[in-house]
Amino acid sequence: MTANPGTGGRNSDLASAVDTVTARYEAANPASRAQYERARKSLPGGNTRTGMFYTPFPLAIETAAGATVTDVDGHLYTDFVGDFSAGLYGHSHPAIREAVLATLDGGMAFGSTSPGEARLAALVCARFPSIEQVRFTTSGTEANVLALATARAVTGRDAIMVFEGGYHGGTIYFGRESAPINLPFPHLIAPYNDPEEAQRLIRENANRLAAVLVEPLQGASGGIPASAGFLEALREACSGHDVLLIFDEVMTSRLAPGGRQEQLGIVPDMTTLGKYIGGGFSCGAFGGPAEIMTVYDPSRPGAFVHHGTFNNNVFMLNAGAAGLEKVFTPPVQAALNAAGDSLRASLSELAARHGAPFQATGLGSLMNLHLQREPIHSIRDIAPKDPRLRQLLHLDLIDRGFFTTRRGYITLSLAIAESDCAGLIEAVDEFLTHHGHLLDSAPPE
């Protein structure tokens, strides 16, 4: 395909390319389309997890093994979604499977504490020095809700500070503004990676701020790392004004044994965890120093009540402990994130060689593909693009056998091999060869 000199020509070529890849996708996936239509009758939009939707209809995955998923039409894909970082161990890792089967044989839903509860808690506390004590929840969302509620209760203040582009769960989500179904906590929204503005807002609102909640890398908004200087500025301002600093390490805890906080040497007052911590089962956790967490000790007068039927789900506890003890050891963790750094560097080299508006942001095994040249330090830096460009890239990669996300987010699992990464690099190379000239297409008016 020859590039046309004008924007109008590029947009015409883009329409043709998108129509072609979409038609091929539709023809190849009749069973996924049928599943989507059936699901729409009982589920709004055909799903119960908004991020799973994409046009013209999403693939319906039926089985998975190792680093691959298979859809209802029988197509096998290399999985670069990694369940948005929850699928760290790949699909049915032997050590996780063994723990799950042993748990199944031993019974479930005890209605009591179990040895697995203290076992997983001890493993978490050993990895995160800032977490002296921890409590479990059923999701990262719930962990963040409880951390914020704890901060508000122990400080006696009601407001929280979050950041543009922050995602802390389905009810604590901030793009450029607060989402309609967010919990009604009084809040301030500050620009991400702007240390001076963040310090100013903390200083001017210290009398009502209970906590500052921040992701060391914003996943949902595009794999955008926080600079060390930004996080250090938050630590300094929070310490100076008795505001609790909460690190949402639901995703970034995979970057080092003690998470991103260990890598940077910045100690938060509280930390939230989730995703892979439960070994692939629904899980969340929040923790911090004993002086804060002791408010949940039910043997103490006036203790805070934290119920939850599945907080100590034995499958989550035992699978999570097996994963941390037997699989995700520090050397394995380092190798996984080195592989991610290598993949991201290779993708950047491709962009430079093709002269294409394309880049991969992120840290370690967490990354996001962007269709622009300009550096990205916050959601404000993400240029408006014709959404058909993302559709073109996404469906093209699916057509080549790579299961990815529409927004370009990629997380590596331990099952991903060097050859899988090489295959993805080759697929992106071919995409840029055939369609790179379209990536400068003007956004729709």
State each model region's role.
Residues 2-7, 327-330, 338, 396-445:
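PLP-dependent enzyme catalytic core of the Aspartate aminotransferase-like
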Residues 76-154:
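Glycine-rich loop-to-alpha-helix module at the N-terminal edge of alpha/beta enzyme cores
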Residues 215-228, 242-264, 270:
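Conserved PLP phosphate-binding loop immediately N-terminal to the Schiff-base lysine helix
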Residues 266-296, 312-317:
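Active-site PLP attachment segment
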Residues 341-344, 354-392:
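Conserved PLP-binding catalytic core of the aspartate aminotransferase-like
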